[in-house]
């Protein structure tokens, strides 16, 4: 039984028990489709009958309204059923949050009940020959013709290609450069299978996501009514961004269940595999590898549901959802590699799930935003957090004769604000932080003046060759550091000298 967290509601705990039982009952059937290399339509229908495709859809539209936590609970378990989990995630995320946030009431009433029932599978179509991680570089076009839109272009690496009935696509509706700079050149649409000119071009043989068709789509003068447009014209980028936190979260959650399964598999295997006259679970190396996998599973799972709780509370955890997607994918790949190592030659065969785990994890590091994109998001949004950007003040402490972190004011605070004293502030920073520049605010706070006056004086110092200024592309002063000439003018050379007590006087020069 999967461990429920203390903050789960009784309904969430009930759903967790129910879906785990469902998966256990149908696990053998999922294995059969894996070996037959067939798309598991009967299993998909069972999932639909249980209503699980409606996990994240409001009850008013026929869904279960389980929120982010409930959706992760379902994804965690269905991910154990090989291709079923990926089909569930992609179909549920094929415009769900976008429709909820941008569609008209009429559109919601038309599309959401179908999604909730699982009558139709869905796919998300962003990637193109021209657009991968650079998702804004879409070249597929949509031109207005009366009450219709005419779509031309191609999409590729579309999970669920061919088996899906509805395709949530993003197309370029403006060639204006100013629109492109403002990300106002895209519009989102729903395109149904069967539209004239809309065809499946190719299926990709991926290293993972077994039996889930992934392919190329071709649009050749495909006509759709304006009622299939989701959101305003030119707001496709905003529509795309809507619900990304939820999507990354669930895309990570679908891998959690297989991590637990591999732990069970390894305990089972190593208890029964004997080498050097003892079971292999007694070897410290194997114990360490399994301990690593257990740690990754428990840390990844708990962080996933913490992030889900944040979303259910109305927050937008951009950083945490990116972390979830990134670490779960990496954990799965690493766990697969470790499991293979523990199982030896058996781990290399398809008779055991270790090799599949490694392959699935590698795909997970690419789809739904690469690991590198997640890291970029984590860094960029973290760089905006005040808590991470509080300056660290290093002050020279005479008692210990060393720079230490301190909240006390600068020794230069209150001096007359002029070139001489400002140069001393900047030169003194060389003694404390020899490899670093100072910001305008660092200098301003140390001497006690305004930003404008600080900029004015450092410009004058620059003209005299006493400081080096690093500017932005727009020419704004960003960072300042004393030049060698500035250091000499500010203080005598002895001011900058520092030697540990053990250093011999005779060796100085």
Predicted regions and their residues:
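Alpha-helical interface subdomain recognition
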Residues: 1-81, 85, 90, 102-107, ...
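A short core secondary-structure module
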Residues: 152-200
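Short acidic, hydrophobic short linear motifs in intrinsically disordered regions
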Residues: 432-446
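A short, conserved structural fragment
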Residues: 462-472
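Short, amphipathic alpha-helical interaction segments positioned at domain boundaries
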Residues: 484-509
